[in-house]
Amino acid sequence: MAYQEKITEFKNWATNLGCPPTALPTDDALRRIFKSGSSLLLNQLQSRIQPVDYVREVRENLLIAQVARYKDKMVPLASRSFQPPELQRYQKIQELKKHKEKANQQLTEARKEYQKLSAGIKTKNIQTISAENRKQLLESKCNILDLKLESLNKNYDQELKNKIQILGTTPVKLSARNASEAQATRAVEQALKQLETFYGMCDDGNAVNNLAEAKQRLWDQMRSTFADIPNSLLLNVVMKIKEEQLQHIMKLNESRGECTNDKPPLNNYEVKLLKTKADMLGLAAKYFAAQKELELKEERFCQDYSVFVDKLQSKVYRFNGISLGDEENADELISDYLVQYNMRNFNRSQNEFLREQIEQLRLELDAGAKQLENHDLKLGSVKQVYGDINSSINRIQQDMVQLSQIKEKILFSRNMMKNLLDDMQAATQKQNAKSQLMSTKLKVSNMSMLGAESFCLANDSVFSSTKVEFDGNCSAINSTMRRSFDNKTLVPGGAASTTLMAASGATLPSHLLEFNTFLEIPLEKFSCTPRACSFLLSANPLIVEAQELASTVQLAPGYLLTPFGALQEVRKRILWASAIAAHTSELKLNLQPLIVDPHDLRLKASRQHEEIDQLLDNLMAIGVKTQLQLEKAERIYQFLLENPLRRYVPPSKRYNNGSFADYESEFNLYYRMTTNGSSMRAPPN
């Protein structure tokens, strides 16, 4: 039985410690343990380890016994530190209970007040929502009524305009009141003044809307001016004014025809100067237009900027939870943001502008390269033309060499003819005058025949394709023969050393003297052709009067046989020389190649990259500051969620000369003190 009592006592002790009955060993196992030598250790363990309730009760009894000694005695507060710690904790617990009751009462009162305020806010929200809905309904009705009123006003205005137009288009009847022509003249003069003011407004270059309004106002004034005047009187006055204007124009034309002081024509410098002035005026007009546009954009920017800053400030306040007291910090933050944002936009636009400038310069370089290639091609073509000219010059020189050889042959035949003539003159000196005259005719004919024979002996393949008839040449040569009255002989023009006939005391017949007399008169005197035609058809004196034979004259080109053709050829040569000079001057390129320094561009790009990196660093700093503000806002939000009042109490608001943080720290202190003392027994209620 003794072992059974020990077993039951052990089971009670284990269950008091909190051990479940299923985890206890069986009775046989416990009996074997008690029978063995380890029963003493088990008894010591049971005596040393007691349940928590038993230990707490013992401690409370000891505390009650200690408190009983101080019963009905005065215990000063200063001597609390000399009291036992259990008593100190007990007194603190009592004080904390009182504070807890007060806090609970305050919490209940605050909850009731909060519930009342929330109910009032809900009712007010319902009332405001209903009022807003009613306001929107009334505004919609007002808008509908405004639209209807506007449409009615438009219809009314249109009807008034139609009425005025009908009255204005109705022709005026002629009556005794409006039959005076002076009244019509005054109306026309007034209308002309109104037109002058309107055209002056058009010349000033006002806006299109102002011009439209001025045009409408002009038509209204015209209708009011001609309202009481018939069309017939207006037509008579207008025709009289037109007649006066025509008379004035005719007088001006007569005076202009009489005056001869015309202005001298402008030279190239004055024309270029006027063009430059016109370009300067155009640039000035563009500058003033750009300045006006800049002023308009500045006004628009100021308007939009103020609205943008207000919206941004409200968003920053709402996002960061900034109160009105921290307005300076918010303004500083907004100004920093605006400066950074504007700098970033400015740098982006500057980079885009530089990129466009680089592309434009690259295109200009490509265009310059293409232009250089085109000029190279033109130079090649010009060189080819010059090569053709050189080859033609060489060919002409070869032809001239051949012509010099032909000239030698002609001189040889001429000398041979001179010898033949001398022999014939020596044989005919002994004849009489009549036979001399006959012999003279024969000699002249023989001379022409010999010239023709010598001409035929030459190689015809080397002569020019332009040939003059031999009879014409002979007549031209005969027309240049002149009379020598000293020795009574006939001498060819330009060949004084050659004598066709020796007079030697012989007398010429009268008809031959008359022939020699008329021979000196030019051919133009005997023809019916005018001087201009003779200039075009007569022979060139530079060729005819030269001491050359007919065969030599035939070698000259056809355009040199007349003075007109020679002048035309000279003009052609002058034009050709001026064209070549102009072409050579055009070949001189005035291109100034565009120089792009890649080193400067790299330096500029590096500087811009550094500025961009600095801006990115500033943006990162702003992002970090924003993240800190977000974390602060998140902490405030978590605090609001954990706060039982569900609202933020600012530090400036105090209660009994203490802030909310002081009360919170004191409450946390008491709460830790109560929760850390796990072995303390809570006092009964």
Swiss-Prot record:
Its main location: cytoplasm. As part of the augmin complex, plays a role in centrosome-independent generation of spindle microtubules. The complex is required for mitotic spindle assembly through its involvement in localizing gamma-tubulin to spindle microtubules. The name 'dim gamma-tubulin 5' derives from the decreased gamma-tubulin staining of the spindle pole seen following RNAi-mediated knockdown of dgt5 in S2 cells. The keyword Cytoplasm applies. The keyword Coiled coil applies. Component of the augmin complex composed of dgt2, dgt3, dgt4, dgt5, dgt6, msd1, msd5 and wac. The complex interacts directly or indirectly with microtubules and is required for centrosome-independent generation of spindle microtubules. It comes from the Eukaryota. The lineage of its organism: Eukaryota, Metazoa, Ecdysozoa, Arthropoda, Hexapoda. It is found in: Cytoplasm, Cytoskeleton, Spindle; Chromosome, Centromere, Kinetochore; Cytoplasm, Cytoskeleton, Microtubule organizing center, Centrosome; Chromosome, Centromere. It comes from Drosophila melanogaster (Fruit fly). One of its GO terms (cellular component) is cytoplasm. GO terms for molecular function: protein-macromolecule adaptor activity. This is Augmin complex subunit dgt5. GO terms for biological process: cell division; mitotic spindle assembly; mitotic spindle organization; mitotic spindle-templated microtubule nucleation; regulation of mitotic nuclear division. Residues 87-165, 342-379 form a coiled coil. Keywords: Cell cycle, Cell division, Centromere, Chromosome, Coiled coil, Cytoplasm, Cytoskeleton, Kinetochore, Microtubule, Mitosis.
